[in-house]
């Protein structure tokens, strides 16, 4: 199965799961130091004698039979490589407030009015992954990352081929779209800003490769009265001072945007007011009744001016 890493930057929590088990491959043999004559040398150090043949998997042909099949009833098992994540950790999470897009609204008329600001922009979430360069373990599996940002935000995800050398960078688009209506008095102006948290974090996942099973051996002439032997692969590794486990580290650096909100700044007073997007907003720090009074007074004055203008026209 593929590997899955779940990380929540806001909570600083991370977990990982998945496992791959397969018959030991040639690349695994190289990684554990059992390729070519190294396998024979390891058996020699364990048994004190160079074997005629040594195998970690079928076909292990000796005496006209496959030793793993012929002695399966005695518990002889091909060597299996097991790869699994054992820990995931979030390092150095950090966020800064940044302005995504702005809009300037001005009322250049002689009447109060409502002005609409459409705020939209597109940016990217990104992830760059790198691997331990010397592990030598090859697995045809992907690693999927689900990265949560802050509470209530939808997580974003990436998928990489496991263990691919060098760095891989992936980016996904993030769209910010909102609209707000602002009530402005004559001559008044504001800057409406769409802001978001821009964040960074590093996610480190540690994997472990281990082996189980037996190394099948053939000795001719017989060794201690027997041609065929099988011993735990880990016993043979330990006798040769070779590792019984290999640890691989994967590092992912993520950059993200989240937790957007809108505010506005009065062009004259410089006052910044946080706002939503479902109401009509008045940037001045006045009570609604006071603004309503001003609007009604202004409307009455306009009506009075119209009436006086009509009288002058009749004369």
From Swiss-Prot:
Region (Disordered): 295-315
Compositionally biased tracts (Basic and acidic residues): 299-315
Residues annotated as transmembrane: none
CDD domains named in the record: PFM_spherulin-2a-like
Domain of life: Eukaryota
Primary role: Structural protein.
The protein's name in its UniProt record: Spherulin-2A
Native organism: Physarum polycephalum (Slime mold)
């Amino acid at each position: 199965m593929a590997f899955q890493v779940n990380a929540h930057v806001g909570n600083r929590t991370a977990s990982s799961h998945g496992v791959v088990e397969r018959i030991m491959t040639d690349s695994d043999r190289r990684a554990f130091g059992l390729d070519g004559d190294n396998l024979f040398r390891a058996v020699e150090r364990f048994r004190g004698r160079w074997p005629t043949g040594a195998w970690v998997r079928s076909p292990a042909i000796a005496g006209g039979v496959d030793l793993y099949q012929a002695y399966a009833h005695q518990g002889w098992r091909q060597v299996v490589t097991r790869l699994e994540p054992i820990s995931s950790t979030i390092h150095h999470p950090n966020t800064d407030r940044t302005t995504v897009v702005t809009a300037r609204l001005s009322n250049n008329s002689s009447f109060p009015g409502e002005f609409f600001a459409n705020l939209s922009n597109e940016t990217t979430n990104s992830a760059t992954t790198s691997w331990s360069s010397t592990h030598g373990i090859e697995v045809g599996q992907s690693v999927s990352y689900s990265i949560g940002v802050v509470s209530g935000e939808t997580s974003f995800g990436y998928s990489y081929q496991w263990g691919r050398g060098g760095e891989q960078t992936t980016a996904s688009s993030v769209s910010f779209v909102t609209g707000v209506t602002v009530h402005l008095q004559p001559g008044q102006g504001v800057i409406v800003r769409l802001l978001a948290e821009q964040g960074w974090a590093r996610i480190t996942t540690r994997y472990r490769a281990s082996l189980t099973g037996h190394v099948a051996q053939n000795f001719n002439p017989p060794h201690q009265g027997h041609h065929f032997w099988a011993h735990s692969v880990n016993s043979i590794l330990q006798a040769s001072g070779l590792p019984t486990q290999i640890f691989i580290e994967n590092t992912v650096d993520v950059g993200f945007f989240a937790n957007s909100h809108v505010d506005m700044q009065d062009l004259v007073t410089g006052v910044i007011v946080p706002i939503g997007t479902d109401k009509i907003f008045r940037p001045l720090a006045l009570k609604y009744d006071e603004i309503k009074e001003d609007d009604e007074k202004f409307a009455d004055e306009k009506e009075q001016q119209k009436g006086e203008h009509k009288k002058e026209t009749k004369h």
